[in-house]
């Protein structure tokens, strides 16, 4: 059994399948599919604990968002642990994490956002060309465009126009927010 679970290609495929199911939301990846495609000679009773172990390891690595030094320390500890993993399995897991870390992290970030977020912000200063009152023509106005949306969905755009008074009010509020954050961040 142990030799059958050693193959690096099979383990790499298993980790990819687990990532598809666990992090990317592809529900078609089942325990039976992984076993039949990657480890057909291993019984389901032998495969289940191995699958659970690899899934747990992958979830631990992803939830801690391990950098490569942390990963190496974690995998080294697992190789020394009774019933842990082999050094060959550790090498495959390390290689897998190095090539999939960014994509898994992005997927977890997208899953953790419940509401829409700010995707982009652009602004410019223009001269007002139309107004109800002729005295307001050619006065400077700040135009701000916000792109708001959730990953995987179409964005909405919000366009705001500020005169000089409103810009100063916004800047004052931002300064107050900055002061509040600085106060909260002061060591006690």
From Swiss-Prot:
Record PTM text: Ubiquitinated; undergoes both 'Lys-63'- and 'Lys-48'-linked polyubiquitination. Ubiquitinated by XIAP, leading to its proteasomal degradation.
GO CC, alphabetical: Cul2-RING ubiquitin ligase complex; cytoplasm; early endosome; endosome; endosome membrane; nucleus; recycling endosome
Record GO biological process: copper ion homeostasis; negative regulation of NF-kappaB transcription factor activity; negative regulation of protein localization to cell surface; negative regulation of sodium ion transmembrane transport; positive regulation of protein ubiquitination; protein transport; regulation of proteasomal ubiquitin-dependent protein catabolic process
Keywords linked to the UniProt accession: Copper, Cytoplasm, Cytoplasmic vesicle, Endosome, Membrane, Metal-binding, Nucleus, Protein transport, Transcription, Transcription regulation, Transport, Ubl conjugation, Ubl conjugation pathway
Chain sites annotated for binding Cu cation: 100, 109, 133
Keyword Ion transport assigned: no
Domain of life: Eukaryota
Residue span, COMM domain: 117-185
Major subcellular location class: nucleus
Region (Required for binding to PtdIns(4,5)P2): 124-188
Transmembrane stretches, start-end: none
GO MF entries: copper ion binding
Region described as Sufficient for interaction with SLC12A2: 1-122
Cellular localisation: Nucleus; Cytoplasm; Endosome membrane; Cytoplasmic vesicle
Family note: Belongs to the COMM domain-containing protein 1 family.
Functional note: Scaffold protein in the commander complex that is essential for endosomal recycling of transmembrane cargos; the commander complex is composed of the CCC subcomplex and the retriever subcomplex. Can modulate activity of cullin-RING E3 ubiquitin ligase (CRL) complexes by displacing CAND1; in vitro promotes CRL E3 activity and dissociates CAND1 from CUL1 and CUL2. Promotes ubiquitination of NF-kappa-B subunit RELA and its subsequent proteasomal degradation. Down-regulates NF-kappa-B activity. Involved in the regulation of membrane expression and ubiquitination of SLC12A2.
Oligomeric and partner information: Component of the commander complex consisting of the CCC subcomplex and the retriever subcomplex. Component of the CCC (COMMD/CCDC22/CCDC93) subcomplex consisting of COMMD1, COMMD2, COMMD3, COMMD4, COMMD5, COMMD6, COMMD7, COMMD8, COMMD9, COMMD10, CCDC22 and CCDC93; within the complex forms a heterodimer with COMMD6. Interacts with VPS35L; the interaction associates the CCC complex with the retriever complex. Identified in a complex with an E3 ubiquitin ligase complex composed of TCEB1/elongin C, CUL2, SOCS1 and RBX1; in the complex interacts directly with SOCS1 and CUL2.
Protein name (database record): COMM domain-containing protein 1
Gene behind the chain: COMMD1
